[in-house]
């Protein structure tokens, strides 16, 4: 009790003392704050500061040594120890030491700051490496297979580390330069990122094409990608033609109405503005900048002395050169993507199932498009898999394919004969008065060619059903047949057209002779009347009254423009009637009709890939050929492609349905590019023929007054270049040599690119084949091991009382082998494993009758591990491993 009383009193005194001490400290703090505000320090504070200074001096004297040299040595040793530590550890140690350090160590903080500022080169290098590693972690953090919580934590720590220690690299020598380099690096990274985003945003119609691809597959989207590429090509050609030919003539040439070639003839002026005349590109359209005959033959025009005839010829040929370069470059770039569109990789469906979704999508519409795109890609892969597993009668299939090709050849021959006959009829109509002809007779050629391009592709598609190719291969055959159709029609048209040109040249010679005789008669009469032989003024005849030649170049240009415009009209009307009106009928009349309009006839239309692609390619061929005779044709084609993108995208999304067998398109459009390259060469030949062979018209165009069009080049060489250059060009400008060398170089380039592409594809296929062989060999090894174990188990059952079975080793006792279940049934062929490879004996087939089960008298063995994937569950056949494991109950 006494002890408790003493303890209680001691606690009371302690509590009272603590409370009194707190009150005194509170009073002292208040008085100190008041005196600080008044600017007068407290006497107690002065004594405390003096005491602290004495303690600091004593601590430095005890720890640092008795001299300045000793203190410097201690400081140097401490600095060396800190250098051995990593930078983050050093910082942590510094923080810990600062927390442990007493208030008396505040005076040494300046020394630590001086140590920070004087880092060695090794520390700087280590710090740079760690900062770069953190930056790489920030850049590649998205690819890490971590949880989002861990990613955010690592990102925050890495960013704090970079922000903290990146500034330390700039301390000391070269601080400003390093800070400037860091700032410029960050600015450059941000600029590159913004520029990439800007380039992506500047890709025209990207979102529209992605939407089409998500609903209709990559095969339909490949057409719109090709259409966008064609639009870019024609935009560049439009810039060349208008910038170097049309605009110089408009700004620096002779104004309209001053010379006969820029004036409507007197007999045509009354009907020059009629719609029927303008619709056929006659009247004022014929004598405008759209066509060849409008341009003057002056060697130089304007104050710039611009050589318009030379520019016209070089631009007309340069269009082909630029197009050839772009097409070959695109084919070479696409060759690396390679393949025929089939996915030759393994585990296709697993990759699509687990990696198709984009988890950064935040827009519901984008999510719907991505869902549709994933579904379509599964359909494409299923079609490829079905085609690989298809079994067919090869002899019947060959017969049907031969029959289909014979029918298609008959169609091609009939279409060519029809076009030739129609062009011959049009030549007969041209000799008659145009007022006596009907609209059908005037436009018979264009109508027949457009109708053949409209009717033959569906006919070819119906015949191709006999062949039963894979959809991708069937598309290539369809493209080739329509290509042959369009090519035959086009060249039949050209042959007939050049026959007409020869007739116009004969007519032009007669008109030229009449004009020459009229001028000679005028000069002779003027000389006799005024007795003057020099400085005779030309005849005062109005430009509209001058006798004109037929100007065959303008007539050829008009034919190409009419073909292009009629093709646009037929295409748009086909979409409007065949797709839109058909979709309206199916959509609104399906509820009140006798049969199901969606499932039966007429149903919704499918997008015709082959017809649209070939139409686009041959329309471009007509642009290449017609641009030399009608410079305004390139501008018309640019407007056509621009409107086609919006019009056809709307028609596909609103009126069409996906193909019944959705297939994957080629990862590169090289098949389309190959057809385009062939059309480019075929389009170049008529233009080269007219430049090198046919004489230009004498009263229209920039080459009038010359024997051949290429004489402009020789004239420029003779008048603008030194004489020795003229000799060199005269030897090198042999037309046969030039054409042969150009064609040889082009074909060599194509052969080289094709060979390189095939070599890369073959090497890739060989590597894939080797990898597949190794994988199959590994599977066979595993399956053979399993089947061998099964045979050995069955042989064990045949041995009497298992007297010949060797005793199991220690390892086998510890790790018993897994055995399949007796009750499970094996499906498939006998002797085939589950994967289709290796030797595998059926489990239901036994080599002999089962031995009688002996009673189990030993202790149960260790429990077996669970079955592997693909193996059945349940007890194994044969003698049990222990009590209650498949054998009879033990006898008691």
Curated annotation (Swiss-Prot):
Q: In which tissues is it expressed?
A: In adults, expression is restricted to the hair cells of inner ear and lateral line organ. Expressed at higher levels in the larval lateral-line neuromasts than in the larval inner ear.
A Pfam family annotated for this UniProt entry: TMC
- Residues folding into a coiled coil are none
Query: Which GO molecular function annotations are given, in alphabetical order?
Result: mechanosensitive monoatomic ion channel activity
Q: Where is the composition biased (Basic residues)?
A: 48-58, 66-77
Q: Enumerate the UniProt keywords alphabetically.
A: Membrane, Transmembrane, Transmembrane helix
Subcellular location, record wording: Membrane
Fetch the InterPro entries from UniProt: TMC, TMC_dom
Major localisation? membrane
Give the transmembrane ranges: 235-255, 275-295, 308-328, 403-423, 444-464, 482-502, 616-636, 671-691, 736-756
Q: Name one GO cellular component term.
A: plasma membrane
The UniProt record lists the keyword Transmembrane: yes
Q: Where do Low complexity bias regions lie?
A: 103-112
Q: Where is the composition biased (Basic and acidic residues)?
A: 772-785
State where composition is biased (Pro residues).
862-878
Q: How does it sit in the membrane?
A: Multi-pass membrane protein
Q: Where is this region: Disordered?
A: 29-125, 772-791, 796-892
GO aspect biological process, one term: vestibular reflex
The family classification in the record reads: Belongs to the TMC family.
User: What is its biological role?
Assistant: Probable component of the mechanotransducer (MET) non-selective cation channel.
What's the protein called, per UniProt?
Transmembrane channel-like protein 2-B
What species is given as this protein's source?
Danio rerio (Zebrafish)
Point out the gene that encodes the protein. tmc2b
